[in-house]
Every structure is written in structure tokens, then in C-alpha cells.
Amino acid sequence: MKSNNALIVILGTVTLDAVGIGLVMPVLPGLLRDIVHSDSIASHYGVLLALYALMQFLCAPVLGALSDRFGRRPVLLASLLGATIDYAIMATTPVLWILYAGRIVAGITGATGAVAGAYIADITDGEDRARHFGLMSACFGVGMVAGPVAGGLLGAISLHAPFLAAAVLNGLNLLLGCFLMQESHKGERRPMPLRAFNPVSSFRWARGMTIVAALMTVFFIMQLVGQVPAALWVIFGEDRFRWSATMIGLSLAVFGILHALAQAFVTGPATKRFGEKQAIIAGMAADALGYVLLAFATRGWMAFPIMILLASGGIGMPALQAMLSRQVDDDHQGQLQGSLAALTSLTSITGPLIVTAIYAASASTWNGLAWIVGAALYLVCLPALRRGAWSRATST
């Protein structure tokens, strides 16, 4: 099944899923203030964020493997049903252990990015995959911009309103999938080994595949570097530019919009014109240059033109995903996408800890060091990019 209708449905599902995730983020600290002692809010908030990323790391490979066996549609629908029930319970039961349990369930059901990626690989011809992966990233980005904005507005009415809205949104997403989503991969009714449920073992399938292993290493590094702005943007903006909360929110919205536009309208043409390899290199170069410029920026307005570079750097990841998806057959797309989603979640757990530690250690002397370290990490990708196998994995 290779139709535009299928692509529209899965992109709509990804967008609504991202909005649902973003809806609850602005109110989590406020909700914690209502149910725990004020001195422990920061620690609880950090644990809740880490729990979400940890569950995605543990469950993304499993969901990907399940979708290879049973098909993409039932796994996606089951996850959406679980998310709907989870958000509905959290909206009506303001108890700390329920909040923790809810973030665990949300992390499990939010690991569907792997299945969505496999779905797109199923319905897309090789030459269009980079563009369609870019569209998927753009839709997720749009949802993550719209979700927090809507969550903040609803949170002003009630701290529980965003959770209720997320439940409704996931319910609508479930209905969309039930009536409009077609199966893209019938699956193989073969037994699932126990190692499929081990997130570490889920990477072993790539050990004998030189190209895949090298490209997954590049993927991990790129995702790790991407954690630098995620972890530092707010605190760096406050310390370096003296930005207010309103200004920080505005800058995040602008960056989200620019990133979505680049993913939607630049990735496809750039990949078709220059090839996947050059698109990846160009993305890393733009990102690294943006980091270096931010490290030395002295005025808040300078960050906004630099955002264009950072957004342009986003073209590299969809090109890399497309390249990776062509290295495995259709029956293992879910396993591949699950491994990639697990790597992303792993960087979401470790990246902020590493980046903020560097920032804290250097802030008293020069708070731009973490950006330079992030840019330098791209150099680690060069050995993988120079491998002889790399040239065989690219298309022009």
C-alpha cells in the first residue's frame, strides 16, 4: 500500500500524538505543587521526565518488534487506547503515585514513534523516504509547539484541563486510526524470542551489519548533540541574554516553527538534489556552526538569525533515517525504527545530565563551553562517514 491517503493519516496521527504529549508539559510543575512539598518539586519533576524517557527506551524496541509480527495498525491503536485511558485517569485523580504511574504509561504508549516510522517506510518508495521522514518530524514539531501553547492556556483555567484535553485528543486520534488507517504490513506470525523484550538485546541484530551499525552510531551522536539546546536553551537564555519567561517562550515557538518548516520543505528537495550523504553532512555543518555562533553571541536578538542555521541542521536526521531504512528489509522495519527510538530515548536520559553538568562546571568562567562541546561531537561521526561501506549506503 503506497498512497498519499495513508501518508496523510499517519502524519495526522503523529501530529495529534505530539499535541497530546505537549499539552501536559506546562502544567506538570504546577500539579506537583498541589500534591507535594515545595522543596521536593524540582526532584520529582526531574524524575517524572526521566521516567518518561526511560520507558520509551525500554518499550520502543518491543513495540517495533510487535509491529513486525502483528502489523503496524493494531500496535498503534492499542497504544492510543492506552494513552486515552491514562490521561483520563490522571485528569481525575490528583495523587502522586497516580502521576508517576501515568508518566510510566505515557512513556510506554508514547513510544509509538518507532511504529509510525516503520509505517512510513512501508508505504514510501526509497527515493521519497527522506522527504516523508522529514514531514513526520515536521508534524511532530508542529504538535510539540502547539501542544505546550494550548496546555499553558488550558492550565490557566485548571491544572487538570490539559490532561482531559489530551485524553480527548488521543480518543479522537484512536477513532481516526480505527476508521481511516489501513494496515501497511501484515506481519509474520512467528514466535517472538525473549530477547525482543530486552532493550539492550534489541541492538544486537545490527552487530553483523557494518553499514547499519555505523549509521546507528551516527544517529546516536546526532541525537545526543540535539540534547544540547533541549537542555540549555532556557537556562542559557536567562543567564546570557537575561531573557524573561515570555521571551523564552517566544524564542521556543519561533524555533519550533522554523524547524518544522525546514523539515517539511527543505529536507526533501535537498536530499533529492544532493543525495542523502550530502544532506546529512550539510545538516551537521549547519548545526555545528549555529552552536559555535550561539556560544559567542552577546545579544539576545542574535539568537534569532542563528535559529535559521539550527533549523536547517534538522535536514540531516530525516536523510539519515531514510538511508538506514533502506538497509533492512520490510519485515525488520519495525525492529530498526524501534532501535532508533530507543537510542533517541537513551540520549534523552543521558544527554541533559551530561550537558547540564558541563554547563554547571563552566558557567562561572564561560557559559558557552557546552555549545562548543556539542559542535565538536559531530567530529566523532567522521570515522563512520569515511567508511568504505558508507559510499555503498548512499544514493545521489
Swiss-Prot record:
Pfam families: MFS_1. It is a multi-pass membrane protein. GO terms for biological process: proton transmembrane transport; response to antibiotic. Belongs to the major facilitator superfamily. TCR/Tet family. This is Tetracycline resistance protein, class C. GO terms for molecular function: antiporter activity. NCBIfam families: tet_MFS_A_B_C_D, tet_MFS_C. The gene is tetA. Residues 28-45, 101-103, 160, 232-246, 299, 361-364 are periplasmic. The keyword Glycoprotein does not apply. GO terms for cellular component: plasma membrane. Keywords: Antibiotic resistance, Antiport, Cell inner membrane, Cell membrane, Hydrogen ion transport, Ion transport, Membrane, Plasmid, Transmembrane, Transmembrane helix, Transport. It is found in: Cell inner membrane.
